[in-house]
Amino acid sequence: MTNEQQNKDEQYMRKALSEAQQAFDEGEIPIGAIIVCKDRIIARAHNLTETLCDVTAHAEMQAITMAANELGGKYLTDCTLYVTVEPCPMCAGAIGWAQVPRIVYGAADPKRGFQEYAPRVLHPKAECIGGILEEECRQLMQEFFKSRR
């Protein structure tokens, strides 16, 4: 990965972290996601599972729906998804169905992340990069769960 791409990924991950902070402030599990298409943010979302009483209202699912509406179609073939925590198998399935070619996440999720349970669910040509601003993403999650215990 070039320095320019690394800088871009960090810049967009900071936007996803901003969404995660908003979720934290609302009492939601602090995961944020953004979708970028041709260097333009077309969707911003965070977890809404508590607010909507909907177990499927994950940040990635919300962002995919917004992006599809923005682009007028269900395939996000020119997009990159940035999410603060590794997607779960459900979200990874939706990412695969939407044909997102590039996924960038912050903190790994060894307990519920797709790489452990469903590593082949993404489109076969999809590029998946983890560890971008990993410590910041992990700290926000740890702070949230620490405050709940």
Indicate residue ranges for each PLM-predicted region.
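Short beta-strand scaffold segments in enzyme catalytic cores
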Residues: 31-39
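Short, basic and Ser/Thr-rich N-terminal targeting/leader segments
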Residues: 27-31, 77
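Zinc-dependent deaminase
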Residues: 1-25, 87-149
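Immediate flanking context of iron-sulfur cluster ligation sites
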Residues: 73-85
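A short, polar/charged loop-to-alpha-helix boundary motif
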Residues: 51-61
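Residues that line or immediately flank small-molecule/substrate-binding pockets and catalytic motifs
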Residues: 49, 83, 107
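Short beta->alpha transition motifs characteristic of CBS
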Residues: 42-49, 125
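Small-residue (primarily alanine) positions within well-ordered alpha-helices
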Residues: 16, 20-23, 33, 43, ...
